[in-house]
Every structure is written in C-alpha cells, then in structure tokens.
C-alpha cells in the first residue's frame, strides 16, 4: 500500500432529489476524475459516498461544478483488520474497517472561528488550504490536501508539538517527535555516547551531533511540494512517523524553504509577528507560512449535521 494507490471513501452532503441527480454526478466523476467512483447514495438523506484516490478537494470541486452544493461530512479508510473469535469451535473471522479521521485548516479564511474543527487557522495573507488526515492502517496515516496562495518554491508540511494559535504560528513548539521515535533516538544517542568517550574527539562529536540533529529535523517533514506559478501545493502522503491518535490537538505548519512572506495575520488583523526565525528547526525547515490545529473529524456515517457549527452555513 502506498500513497498513490491507497483508496479512501469520502462521504458528502449533496443537494440531490432524484436518481437523475445521482446519474449526473456519476457522469461528471467519470469525465473529470479517473480514479474516483460513486459507490453509495441515499437520496432522502441527500448523501453520497465516493471511493478512489483523487484529492478530496478535487472531488468536492467536481461535484460543485454540476451546480450543486456539496460538503464533505465523513472520511474512512477501505483497509480492514481481521480478528478471530476464540469462542467458536470453528475459526470465525471478523473484518472491521480501520477508522479515524482528522482535519487541519491552514491559513486564514474570512468569517471562520479560529481553531474550530478544521476551520480557521492563521497564516500569511492569501494563503489557505485544508489538510485531511486519515488513519489508513494501525501503523500509517494519510495526509492529503491542497494549499493555495503560495509563492513559487519548495514548501513542506510538518507536525508541530502544540496547538496554540494565540500568537500565530510562533507558539507551536518544535517539530513533534512521537514516543516511539523518541525512545529510538534515545537508544541511538546512548549507543553513540558509549562509542565516543575520547576527549580528543570532542569537535568531531559535536559535528556529528549537529548533523544528526539536522537529519532528525528533516525526517519530521511529512511531504514537500515544489510550488509553481499557480501558487498551489498538493500533498498525498502515507506516513508511518506517528500514532494517529497522538496527532489530535497538535498542529501542522507549512514551512517555506525559499520565499519570504509578509507577516502572518490572525483573524483580527492585530498580530504583529515579523515571521522571525523562532527556533533552531526553522533555520533548517524555513519560514512558517501558515498553520492550523489538527482536529478530530467524522468518519463515514458519524456526521449527521446539516448546519456547520463554525460559521453557521447550511451544509446543503
């Protein structure tokens, strides 16, 4: 299983009223998206479920191009786990879908409440996007989405320790290291220290520590996109760096390795940050262009809301 071939299911609220509505959506999907198909629909509930490998943003825009209002209300993996029941004399196997979904809005969007379930983040003026997270298996997490309004150059997504947006992107801490990774790093450091006790090698040891620290920080990058003139960065990355449930409440930061941006703005336009380098990791990863809180989101069948609690808009 890799990031390009991993199929996911996407549930949407769509204003459909008859079978011809469903048929027109299916036709649009076949013509515009090669890797996504409609697999379920419920006309009375005005809900559809799609399955494929296209970006969720492309799916949403394709359906809206049919002239219908649409919102994503659930995301699920197609991966299943198998368990065996010991109570039966015969081997009874039960398959369960791996579940877990989250969303992170990076950048500024007008009239959205900061920190509200995947809604208002903070960022440089004009930069905005949504990254969706999906627990693809017991050990891997899918990060996918698009961020727009960027300057040409390399941009990287990185999970940071904290989810505090009060001071823009400045108080989000360092790149997050999971407990498993932290234990592994400690073991490696202990081994290195045991093998380097000669005082004459202090300079070499310091150089090695700096190199290892740099590699450690770069290893925290989820994915890197080389932004062109259209100003778009797209990501679809399957990562085994984190336990999915340990990501909720932390943050995702978009770092720019090439371009300088204007100061980050918050929703009240009163943030005086100068986008200064505020950590050692920023010297390696680059400027913090936009950020947002990772918020738990609904899996398929879990979200029955018709009105968004963040901005009060009607879903359909």
Swiss-Prot record:
GO terms for molecular function: copper ion binding; superoxide dismutase copper chaperone activity. Residues 182-210 have a biased composition (Low complexity). CDD domains: HMA. Cu cation 1 binds at residues 18, 21. Keywords: Chaperone, Copper, Cytoplasm, Disulfide bond, Metal-binding. Cu cation 2 binds at residues 308, 310. It is found in: Cytoplasm. GO terms for biological process: protein maturation; removal of superoxide radicals. One of its GO terms (cellular component) is cytosol. Residues 99-298 are annotated as: Superoxide dismutase-like. Disulfide bonds join 169-291. It holds the Pfam family Sod_Cu. Binds 2 copper ions per subunit. Transmembrane segments: none annotated. Its cofactor is Cu(2+). Homodimer, and heterodimer with SOD1. PANTHER family: SUPEROXIDE DISMUTASE CU-ZN -RELATED. Delivers copper to copper zinc superoxide dismutases. In the C-terminal section; belongs to the Cu-Zn superoxide dismutase family. This is Probable copper chaperone for superoxide dismutase.
